Regions:
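Intrinsically disordered, low-complexity segments enriched in small/polar residues
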Residues: 3, 46, 57-58, 136-137, ...
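Generic low-complexity, intrinsically disordered sequence content enriched
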Residues: 19, 25, 42, 46, ...
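Short, intrinsically disordered low-complexity segments
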Residues: 28-91, 124-126
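Ampiphathic alpha-helical segments that act as solvent-exposed interaction surfaces
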Residues: 10, 14-24, 86-111
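Acidic, proline/glycine-rich low-complexity IDRs
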Residues: 99, 103-149
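Residues in well-ordered beta-strands of folded domains
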Residues: 8, 81-83, 115
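Short, extreme N-terminal segment that most often corresponds to the first beta-strand
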Residues: 1-39, 148-149
């Protein structure tokens, strides 16, 4: 069973620009519905597979701190989805994924959100301010140096 982390950036952003930050060797494929997707299998190097897709009229919801429902509806968006096996999650996948998320956030200025399995809110960035959420379940103080928080 895989664990999915998804970073969503608000805006009409070319997928290639995000791929330069997330997975420079990503190859173009298509989604099940025929949309564009850039994908890279980085299991050996980083412990995950990454897919980059875009869309319009997005709707996202997840559990915020304290169990409240967080909702977001970006007009246009790009999703960077990281899929990792549970056996590589802690030693390889999660640290590399968080470093990649930090690199994307440093290289892009758009509002953003990071979720776990589509239902737990981890990070949001609104108007340039990044906020951590549900830190008991995932955050370690060592990550402060990755995110420069």
């Amino acid at each position: 069973m895989a664990v999915e982390y998804r970073l969503t950036l608000a805006g009409d952003i070319p997928l290639e620009q995000v791929a330069e930050l997330a997975a420079p060797g990503a190859v173009e494929t298509s989604t099940a519905s025929g949309g564009r997707m850039l994908s890279a299998d980085l299991n050996d190097e980083h412990g995950y597979v990454v897919d980059i897709t875009g869309g319009r009229h997005g709707y996202y919801s997840a559990e915020d701190d304290g169990g409240a429902l967080w909702q977001w509806e970006p007009e246009a968006y790009v999703d960077v989805s990281f899929y990792m096996r549970k056996d590589t999650l802690f030693d390889k996948g999660k640290p590399h994924m968080l470093a990649t998320v930090a690199r994307i956030l440093a290289g892009r200025a758009e509002d953003a959100a990071l979720t776990l399995n589509g239902d737990v809110l981890m990070l949001t960035r609104t108007a340039g301010t990044t906020q951590k959420h549900n830190t008991d379940g995932w955050y370690d103080e060592d990550y402060d140096r990755i995110f420069h928080l």
